């Protein structure tokens, strides 16, 4: 078997064959009576998501490059890869009511970007609709299909590594292994993750200051922004050309050091 594999490799890829022979030589696997172990291949099982109501809609990535929904997200710096996980709904109220009666009527219906909320298995339990109308009084509408915590990104995180917690779904797209809280009443206690909280950079905002203080007191790690960063949220930082991932990595604090940095950062 090893002989046939060797000749197969020699016929198909001579440079790789030469490298293979050299590795065998350096490992003492050449010469008379030597048996080369058969190569072992490891394949990860493919993951398939169950179809859900979002599949009725068109993905943002499939829209024309001049489409307002696609342009809005591209202008915010969101990558093509992430556009594949967001959807466009031309009639938000009508589509929502077709699956769960939420609105009394569909008057003044509008088009919205659909941000799916999925659990760790990838099953849809809710969604947010982001209005494309800059004058809308309700920029975000959250619809829950099941009684779950309003968290975006659970299906994408690796729980064995640090999980970054940000304040909005779009911000989470700029940070690896991140989830977003889609409401002020989100309870993360049911998740056994090593959290790092990344709140907005608003040292004069009393609510945000209290949230950071609470996270530190509960023993969590937090990001405290350097004074030279003037932008309020991660999206604005990305648009300003800041390397957000490096900036976050270099400004994670916990315990007493977090307290000292926090007290120096806050303005209220």
Go through the PLM ranges and name each one.
Residues 93-194, 199, 208-209:
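Phosphate-handling DNA/RNA-contact segment within nucleic-acid enzymes
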Residues 221-231:
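A generic structural motif
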Residues 103-104, 191-196, 233-246:
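Short, surface-exposed amphipathic charged segments that create phosphate/polyanion-binding patches used
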Residues 195, 199-201, 209-211, 246, ...:
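Conserved catalytic-core subdomain
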Residues 189, 205-208, 232-235:
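Short active-site-adjacent structural elements
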Residues 1-92, 110, 134-136, 203-206, ...:
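Non-catalytic accessory segments of DNA primases and related replication-initiation nucleases
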Residues 245-268:
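Extended, charge-rich low-complexity interaction segments
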């Amino acid at each position: 078997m090893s002989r046939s594999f060797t000749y197969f490799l020699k016929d198909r890829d001579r440079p790789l064959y030469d490298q293979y022979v050299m590795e065998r030589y350096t490992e003492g696997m050449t010469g008379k009576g030597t048996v080369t172990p058969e190569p072992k291949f490891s394949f990860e099982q493919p993951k398939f998501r169950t179809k859900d109501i979002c599949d009725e809609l068109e993905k943002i990535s499939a829209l024309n490059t001049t489409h307002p929904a696609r342009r809005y997200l591209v202008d915010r710096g969101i990558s093509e890869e992430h556009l594949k996980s967001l959807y466009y709904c031309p009639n938000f109220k009508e589509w929502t009511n077709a699956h769960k009666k939420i609105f009394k009527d569909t008057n003044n219906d509008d088009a919205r970007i659909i941000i799916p909320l999925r659990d760790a298995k990838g099953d849809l339990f809710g969604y947010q609709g982001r209005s494309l109308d800059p004058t809308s009084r309700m920029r975000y509408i959250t619809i829950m299909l099941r009684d779950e915590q309003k968290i975006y990104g659970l299906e994408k995180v690796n729980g064995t590594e640090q999980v970054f917690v940000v304040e909005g779904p779009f911000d989470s797209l700029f940070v690896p292994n991140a989830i977003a809280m889609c409401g002020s009443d989100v309870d993360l206690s049911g998740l056994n993750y090593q959290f790092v909280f990344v709140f907005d950079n608003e040292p004069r905002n009393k609510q945000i200051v209290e949230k950071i203080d609470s996270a530190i007191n509960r023993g969590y790690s937090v990001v405290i922004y350097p004074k030279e960063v003037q932008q309020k949220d991660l999206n604005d930082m990305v648009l300003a050309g800041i390397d957000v991932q490096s900036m976050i990595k270099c400004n994670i604090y916990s315990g007493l050091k977090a307290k000292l940095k926090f007290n120096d950062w806050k303005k209220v």
